[in-house]
Amino acid sequence: MIAYLISGLRRTLCLSLLMLGSVHSMAQETIDFSPDAPGATTGVDIMKQGKIDWETGIGLEWDRRNGEHARTFTINTSMFRLGLTPQAEVRLQIDECITHTPEGNFGGIANATIGTKIKVYEGGKVFPKVAFMGTMLIPGGSNAHYLPKHLGFQTHLLFENELSSKFTLGYDLGAEWNGDTESPDLFFGANLTYQPSERWSFFVESYNRYNSKRQDDWAKPGQDSHFNFMSEAGLAYKVSPRLYVNTFYDISFNEFSRYSNIGLGVAWLLN
């Protein structure tokens, strides 16, 4: 596992040096964009037509819920967003992880998706901005440790209200099915963002899932639950009009002291 950790850190360091080396040449640019990362809920903004955004990072998850004892290191998560039209973007994501358990280590592709986000409504003084997001989860083979065995889908309606010049409230309603469970999860998330300056932003959010079938991995050992209650807090810093860096931290309210997830990331407008 140490080798994977070193490999992931090396990739991130090289990427950071590459991008930070470009900051000076980008200082005079006025181009701006809005990354989706970080956060479990998704914003309503669409990439401008023809523009490509790369959002990447690393993370470490510690999970002892329901008697498990696993540490998962995300070596690399990469989301590519391409502005297809003024109203829609195409989204591609692939994550690579390694997990350490008392029984041994395993790793591989942890997430592979293709999807779209479509602008529905621009919003008004009272009414929120609205967007639709649809995602297809690509299945893995019989030896895949993380990917679903069957094709899965996610559909979300995204909303955003500007409460003031510094505060924004976003909320996310959706359904997610990985192809392996009897029924989909219903998703609800709410995100409050505070932006005190042009460069800094801070957020806290609650994101939750409900399944009509009780899930034993959402509760203490020997128990099960219809609900999975999670929360995340984080911040982002705008290095330049094309480059953001961010960090986040997640907890689980189902078993507060038995789960944590921390990550670092960057978002880069490539063109």
Spell out what each predicted region is.
Residues 2-13:
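Bacterial N-terminal signal peptides that target proteins for export
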Residues 28-271:
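Transmembrane beta-barrel domains of Gram-negative outer membranes and organellar outer membranes
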Residues 12-22:
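Bacterial N-terminal signal peptides
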Residues 23-27:
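Sec/Tat signal peptide C-region and signal peptidase I cleavage site
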